[in-house]
């Protein structure tokens, strides 16, 4: 393993100007460059060395917020909004590709880049906003996991919320076993989720001709205000700010070398990994919408927007008790996956922005305590309806923070002074700027709608 800041003899490390501060110790230093890259094997074997981090990122694109918008879109408008799911995924692929480029080119994750590029009076507010986003993310995962436990085992929501604290032990165990073990668990759970939805879709028997047509955009999406509103929700719930910090940190678990040629190859293979993984996330999100369209919209149930109602309707509509059980299992797996990745994102944010390095269990306990307390209070006082409202609030908080992660990412990767010859091409920056503008505008609109109570 090559220590951070050094390079093997005979290889010249590429360093760039343009930063206010010198690069410090890497975040998650216990796993930094711990996974060997096969540099002498075939292209396939070298690419396989980078296989993994993209799937941890893909978890963030299958959170309960995405489930809710996909259920609403499918139940109300059938397959028509599949094109929007595809568009939002393409946006995500582009932004996550920039994350890998930033990390490999500069040796910094997004949090470190913000710290080293901006004065403290800007960097510290960005850190506080990022921490708020991590807490909101964890809150959503607590609620999603608790709902999954309730639907699958009948455990009361308030008890399920408290039980989510147990995953601290799971995270600690996995981190001690090595980063590849973490990736293996995540990919296994994603496989379970895919199997659950594949089975449910086979049961639902969707109209595949209509499914294919749904991936082609139509003018009705813009001309129909109700359809446009749901479409905005799908796009607005797609890119999660913590994923940008997470991806730029965990891609550096690979020991990819220090020369420009080695870094170019690392960017190429890491981008391939995330693109394949996000395509998998696209399949899952499309599956949720297809399931809702085939099960709910086709039978006249056009108002299914929350997880409880969807679960309750699957049994009578599909004529099988297996379908709702699979739905609950998939939700629970999503919750477990997300708690692991949210922990890592929280560690990267804290270490990257302010260089405070807590023991993983302390960091995890603090984040989970902040999430459990409001979730427990709301479930005790207001029940399942309260958790639904809290879930919506967590998505609004994430929307508020998103511009403060996306905009620096696009700016950094465009600057040759910081990135050198590995800076993003002008056309990539142009597309990324448009993507960032669209996401920011849509999120601002969703926030406006949340506080005014009605779409504009």
Curated annotation (Swiss-Prot):
It is a multi-pass membrane protein. Its main location: membrane. GO terms for molecular function: cadmium ion transmembrane transporter activity; manganese ion transmembrane transporter activity; metal ion binding; symporter activity. Keywords: Cell inner membrane, Cell membrane, Ion transport, Membrane, Symport, Transmembrane, Transmembrane helix, Transport. Pfam families: Nramp (PF01566). InterPro entries: NRAMP_fam. It is found in: Cell inner membrane. The keyword Membrane applies. The chain crosses the membrane at residues 47-67, 77-97, 123-143, 151-171, 184-204, 227-247, 276-296, 316-336, 369-389, 392-412, 422-442. GO terms for cellular component: plasma membrane. It comes from the Bacteria. The keyword Cell inner membrane applies. One of its GO terms (biological process) is iron ion transmembrane transport. Belongs to the NRAMP family. H(+)-stimulated, divalent metal cation uptake system. This is Divalent metal cation transporter MntH. It comes from Brucella melitensis biotype 1 (strain ATCC 23456 / CCUG 17765 / NCTC 10094 / 16M). The lineage of its organism: Bacteria, Pseudomonadati, Pseudomonadota, Alphaproteobacteria, Hyphomicrobiales.
């Amino acid at each position: 393993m090559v220590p951070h800041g050094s390079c093997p003899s005979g290889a010249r490390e590429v360093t760039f100007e343009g930063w206010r501060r010198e690069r410090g110790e890497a975040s998650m230093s216990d796993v930094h460059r711990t996974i060997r890259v096969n540099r002498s094997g075939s292209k396939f074997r070298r690419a396989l060395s980078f296989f993994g981090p993209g799937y941890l990122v893909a978890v963030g694109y299958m959170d309960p917020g995405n489930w809710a918008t996909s259920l609403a879109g499918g139940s109300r408008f059938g397959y028509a909004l599949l094109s929007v799911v595809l568009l939002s995924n393409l946006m995500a692929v582009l932004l996550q590709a920039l994350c890998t480029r930033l990390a490999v080119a500069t040796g910094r994750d997004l949090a470190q880049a913000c710290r080293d590029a901006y004065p403290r009076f800007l960097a510290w507010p960005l850190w506080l906003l990022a921490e708020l986003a991590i807490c909101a993310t964890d809150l959503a995962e607590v609620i999603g996991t608790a709902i999954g436990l309730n639907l699958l085992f009948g455990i009361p929501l308030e008890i399920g919320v408290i039980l989510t604290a147990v995953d601290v032990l799971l995270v600690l165990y996995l981190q001690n076993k090595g980063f590849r073990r973490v990736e293996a668990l995540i990919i296994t759970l994603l496989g379970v989720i895919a199997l659950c939805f594949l089975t449910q879709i086979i049961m639902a028997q969707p109209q595949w001709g209509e499914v294919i047509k749904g991936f082609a955009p139509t003018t009705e999406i813009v001309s129909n205000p109700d359809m446009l509103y749901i479409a905005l929700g799908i796009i607005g719930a797609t890119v999660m700010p913590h994923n940008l910090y997470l991806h730029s940190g965990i891609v550096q678990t690979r020991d990819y070398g220090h020369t420009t040629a080695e870094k170019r190859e690392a960017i190429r293979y890491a981008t391939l990994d995330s693109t394949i993984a996000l395509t998998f996330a696209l399949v899952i999100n499309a599956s949720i919408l297809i399931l809702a369209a085939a099960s709910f919209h086709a039978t006249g149930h056009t108002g299914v927007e929350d997880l409880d109602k969807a679960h309750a309707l699957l049994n009578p509509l599909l004529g099988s008790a297996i379908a709702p059980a699979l739905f609950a299992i998939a939700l629970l797996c999503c919750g477990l996956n997300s708690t692991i990745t949210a922990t890592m994102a929280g560690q990267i944010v804290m270490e990257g922005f302010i260089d405070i390095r807590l023991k993983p269990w302390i960091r995890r306990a603090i984040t989970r305590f902040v999430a459990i307390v409001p979730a427990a209070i709301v479930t005790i006082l207001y029940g399942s309806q309260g958790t639904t409202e809290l879930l919506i609030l967590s998505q609004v908080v994430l929307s508020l923070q998103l511009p403060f992660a996306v905009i620096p990412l696009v700016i950094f990767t465009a600057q040759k002074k910081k990135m050198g010859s590995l800076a993003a091409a002008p056309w990539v920056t142009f597309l990324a700027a448009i993507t960032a503008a669209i996401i920011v505008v849509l999120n601002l609109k969703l926030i406006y709608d949340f506080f005014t109570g009605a779409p504009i």
